[in-house]
Amino acid sequence: MRIADYSVTKAVLERHGFTFKKSFGQNFLTDTNILQKIVDTAEINKNVNVIEIGPGIGALTEFLAENASEVMAFEIDERLVPILEDTLRDHDNVKVINEDVLKADLQTRVKEFENPDLPIKVVANLPYYITTPILMHLIESKIPFSEFVVMMQKEVADRISAEPNTKAYGSLSIAVQYYMTAKVAFAVPRTVFVPAPNVDSAILKMTRRKQPLVEVKDEDFFFRVSKASFLHRRKTLWNNLTSHFGKSEEVKNKLDQALENAAIKPSIRGEALSISDFARLSDALREAGL
């Protein structure tokens, strides 16, 4: 019997008198086939260390521990720590850390792996309410995670992996794809969770690029420009950029010059620009003194 078997999950929760907290976005997966598929998608083996976020009662952790060298699981809810100690007692390669991963000193934590030189993958069923902050925190950290295989709301997975000229494409697509390739591996129905969430989920597989997708002179400015370009999706690039940088004649002249230098039409919408276009645009805007 597996932790994820519905009867086992139910028994564990009853034995420990556990009640779900909405504020932590807790939804426990009760489908062993999907858990195996996650591990297979992540290609976990004994030459890989894994960081898991939000292990819950250990359903995914159990599968990870059987396949990985070590698993470091960050759990914010202290009530789940004794439950995890119970459910994972047969696995000595799991370290449960009762800490908010957004506040954790990850640089120090990853040195606590017995073999810290092994590749590190992030495999997790992320809380929906905080998926994007956690992802960006991990991606932008100086830790060279080789891969992320994470469960999230399907809508967010679609946005992250979206291509230009689609409804889902936006600043989040650019922020992630700048650093990583992103592909939806498979969908997960809401019916396989306890309690069932109000949305469907998907597994997103992201692999770190050896170098960022494009070269830019100022990364922070590049992300600022891409965000500003999607301020109002139905507005033109020109309207969004003047809303962000200002509407004085001086600013408009600089914008005109930058768009001309970048060979981008002011009447276009942000969703029509590729990440390479945004790189060219942000460098031209920076050059123009904006």
Swiss-Prot record:
Cysteine disulfide partners in this protein: none
InterPro entries: KsgA/Erm, rRNA_Ade_diMease-like_C, rRNA_Ade_Mease_Trfase_CS, rRNA_Ade_methylase_Trfase_N, rRNA_adenine_dimethylase, SAM-dependent_MTases_sf
Gene Ontology MF, one: RNA binding
Binding site for S-adenosyl-L-methionine: N27, L29, G54, E75, D100, N125
Intracellular or extracellular location(s): Cytoplasm
Pfam hit, one: RrnaAD
SMART domains, A to Z: rADc
Source organism superkingdom: Bacteria
Family named by the database record: Belongs to the class I-like SAM-binding methyltransferase superfamily. rRNA adenine N(6)-methyltransferase family. RsmA subfamily.
Entry-linked HAMAP family: 16SrRNA_methyltr_A
Function per UniProt: Specifically dimethylates two adjacent adenosines (A1518 and A1519) in the loop of a conserved hairpin near the 3'-end of 16S rRNA in the 30S particle. May play a critical role in biogenesis of 30S subunits.
Protein name, UniProt field: Ribosomal RNA small subunit methyltransferase A
Native source organism of the sequence: Streptococcus thermophilus (strain CNRZ 1066)
